[in-house]
């Protein structure tokens, strides 16, 4: 039985080093998809590079934890900037959901302006779209726009709550992450998905070359290790040997 594998590189537009790493992992590796932060410092560079990589599907990486929002968000920003305090606000039930809805629509329109087309799908920086308060907003928006959505089904919600027309992969894994990146770890993710009976799987990754922006990230050098693994010829062979076909959310 053939299974669909989507290897999605998050953080397109974060920095030039991140952008170059994603393009390299697409051209010479197994990355088939990426998601772009439209408020990232290198988003124009990312859009330019994507025009030379037609085989790379580009989705939108919804941002509520970093940088400057595209709309006025007085209920979420501090000194005009987004940040990780969103977690505390979510726990306190204090999220400005109307502001978040407007920002989502604005980032979506900005994506179309940058890339000249709709995103293939939506996910989010630091998985904030999986917050119980935010998920219904993003799920409804994706369904209305006719685009797919990354869904971590280990989160607390029922499939019956999803819009009927919403598309997603059957499985999603963020396990290819951390200090122990290897071919074996990637293949374990596939094997675990197969054992669950999933016919489609998205694997999240963050391949990058190191630059000054990436150097400031808490997750720095493993991004370079990810790039090495994702561009290894043996990995592509092992993926095919397990009955997986590389694709994107356009195939869901």
Curated annotation (Swiss-Prot):
Biological classification of the source: Bacteria, Pseudomonadati, Pseudomonadota, Gammaproteobacteria, Enterobacterales
HAMAP family associated with the record: COD
GO terms classed as biological process: chitin catabolic process; diacetylchitobiose catabolic process; polysaccharide catabolic process
Spans through the membrane: none
Protein name as catalogued: Chitooligosaccharide deacetylase
UniProt source species: Escherichia fergusonii (strain ATCC 35469 / DSM 13698 / CCUG 18766 / IAM 14443 / JCM 21226 / LMG 7866 / NBRC 102419 / NCTC 12128 / CDC 0568-73)
A GO cellular component annotation in the UniProt record: cytoplasm
Family, as annotated: Belongs to the YdjC deacetylase family. ChbG subfamily.
GO MF annotation: an example: metal ion binding
Enzyme class: hydrolase
CDD domains linked to this entry: YdjC_EF3048_like (cd10803)
């Amino acid at each position: 039985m053939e299974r669909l594998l989507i290897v999605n590189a998050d953080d397109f537009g974060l920095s030039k080093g991140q952008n170059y790493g994603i393009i390299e992992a697409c051209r010479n590796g197994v990355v088939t998809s990426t998601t772009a932060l439209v408020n990232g410092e290198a988003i124009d560079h990312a859009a330019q590079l994507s025009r030379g990589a037609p085989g790379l599907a580009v989705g939108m990486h919804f941002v509520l934890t970093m940088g400057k929002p595209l709309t006025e968000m007085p209920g979420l920003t501090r000194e005009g900037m987004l940040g990780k305090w969103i977690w505390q606000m979510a726990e306190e039930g204090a999220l400005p959901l109307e502001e978040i809805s407007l920002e989502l629509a604005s980032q979506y329109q900005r994506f179309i302006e940058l890339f000249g087309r709709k995103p293939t799908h939506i996910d989010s920086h630091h998985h904030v779209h999986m917050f119980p308060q935010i998920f219904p907003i993003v799920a409804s928006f994706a369904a209305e726009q006719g685009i797919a959505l990354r869904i971590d089904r280990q989160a607390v919600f029922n499939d019956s709550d999803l819009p009927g027309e919403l598309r997603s992969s059957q499985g999603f894994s963020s396990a290819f992450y951390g200090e122990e990146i290897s071919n074996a770890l990637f293949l374990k993710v596939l094997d675990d998905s197969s054992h669950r009976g999933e016919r489609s799987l998205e694997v999240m990754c963050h391949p990058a070359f190191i630059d000054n922006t990436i150097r400031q990230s808490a997750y720095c050098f493993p991004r370079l290790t990810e790039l090495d693994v994702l561009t290894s010829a043996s990995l592509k062979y092992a993926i095919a040997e397990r009955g997986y076909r590389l694709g994107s959310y356009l195939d869901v």
